């Protein structure tokens, strides 16, 4: 009898182990499917919206500043913005970004200074230096757009890195927002860095969607 009970106990343990492995495998598969879906959203959004050509204003979303110098990511956004406005001499430009740790000046001031140094007329540039997040970038920039006489439904472009376009567009919360994609130079190092950002962005996008955005 004792041996039979021992066999039954071992069978139950084995059955539970098999069931546990199946559940774990199912969860892993579900996680991979969810990650694949989120990554597809990031990748599909990683391009410049053709409607941006009709934008009435352009907002450059801030990124890190090293002292007073734009970081790699911010430099790529500034170059993309400079290329975008090349044939739009009258469009107002909002440089949006506050001052964070390790930054001697605000991101807005850093961007404005860079644009002026690259030949952009200072009278076109508006500095939004209060924001500390993408949500605040848009909220405070919309206040400036209203002061410029733009209506809520007027098309505006926002410049950010390609991997950030989808999430930033969701945060903007309006069809009037058109992304302009900034990309990094091509090299083995930059490609690896870009891959890292794309993976991280999928998780950030998932968190955003879970919060109902």
Segments (PLM) and residue ranges:
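Short, small-residue-biased leader/transition segments that mark boundaries at the very start
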Residues: 1-7
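Short, isolated positions within intrinsically disordered regulatory regions of eukaryotic proteins
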Residues: 20-23, 118, 211
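N-terminal type II signal-anchor transmembrane helix
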Residues: 11-49
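A structural signal for short, hydrophobic/glycine-enriched beta-strand patches
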Residues: 39-199
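Enrichment for repetitive, rod-forming helical segments
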Residues: 28-29, 84, 174, 207
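Solvent-exposed, charged interface segments at domain starts and junctions
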Residues: 3, 13-19, 94, 99, ...
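A transmembrane-helix-recognition feature enriched in membrane-embedded lipid enzymes
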Residues: 191-213
């Amino acid at each position: 009898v004792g041996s039979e009970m021992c066999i039954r106990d071992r069978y139950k343990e084995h059955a539970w182990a098999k069931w546990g492995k199946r559940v774990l495998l199912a969860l892993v598969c579900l996680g991979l499917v969810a990650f694949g879906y989120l990554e597809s959203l990031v990748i599909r959004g990683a391009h410049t919206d053709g409607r941006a050509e009709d934008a009435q204003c352009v907002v450059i979303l801030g990124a890190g500043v090293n002292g007073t110098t734009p970081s790699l990511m911010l430099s790529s956004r500034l170059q993309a913005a400079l290329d975008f406005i090349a044939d739009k001499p009258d469009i107002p430009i909002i440089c949006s970004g506050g001052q964070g740790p390790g930054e001697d000046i605000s991101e807005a001031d850093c961007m404005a200074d860079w644009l002026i140094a690259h030949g952009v007329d200072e009278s076109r540039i508006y500095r939004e230096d209060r924001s500390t997040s993408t949500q605040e970038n848009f909220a405070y920039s919309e206040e400036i757009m209203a002061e410029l006489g733009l209506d809520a439904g007027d098309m505006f472009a926002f410049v950010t890195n390609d991997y950030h376009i989808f999430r930033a567009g969701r945060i903007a919360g309006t069809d009037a927002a058109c992304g302009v994609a900034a990309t990094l130079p091509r090299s083995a190092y930059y490609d690896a860095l870009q891959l890292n950002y794309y993976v991280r962005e999928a998780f950030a996008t998932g968190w955003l969607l879970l919060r109902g955005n």
